[in-house]
Design a protein with these regions (language model features):
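Conserved hydrophobic/aromatic packing and binding residues within compact polymer-binding modules
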Residues: 15, 29-30, 40-43, 69
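Short, charged recognition helix plus adjacent turn
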Residues: 70-83
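Short basic helix-loop element that most often maps to the first helix and adjoining turn
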Residues: 13-32
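A detector for short, charged/polar N-terminal pre-domain segments
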Residues: 1-10, 79-80
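DNA major-groove recognition helix of helix-turn-helix/homeodomain DNA-binding modules
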Residues: 53-68
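Recognition helix of helix-turn-helix/homeodomain-like DNA-binding domains
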Residues: 34-48
């Protein structure tokens, strides 16, 4: 699995990959999650920080859990370091 620059980018990649694996368009995912297609597009581009309630809605529409999406994103992002 390739690593991405931030957790937001990694989450965007995970959501996009899951959506395409399920054969869903952005519009269908948005409809199923009760969100606007432009918002889903922005999430997949990494343009938006996704809120918890929207992450849960997207996860349900993708037939998975928010925690599973986050775990996959965390595995793809570089470890954070504290200073």
């Amino acid at each position: 699995m390739p690593r991405t620059s931030t957790i937001n980018d990694a989450l965007a990649d995970v959501i996009r990959q899951r959506r395409t694996d399920l054969g869903l368009s952005q519009e269908k995912l948005a409809d199923n999650a009760g969100l606007h297609r432009n918002y889903v597009s922005g999430i997949e581009r990494g343009a938006y920080n996704i809120g918890v309630s929207n992450l849960v809605a997207i996860a349900q529409a993708l037939q998975t859990s928010a925690s599973a999406l986050l775990a996959q994103a965390e595995a793809r992002s570089p470890p954070t370091t504290s200073t």
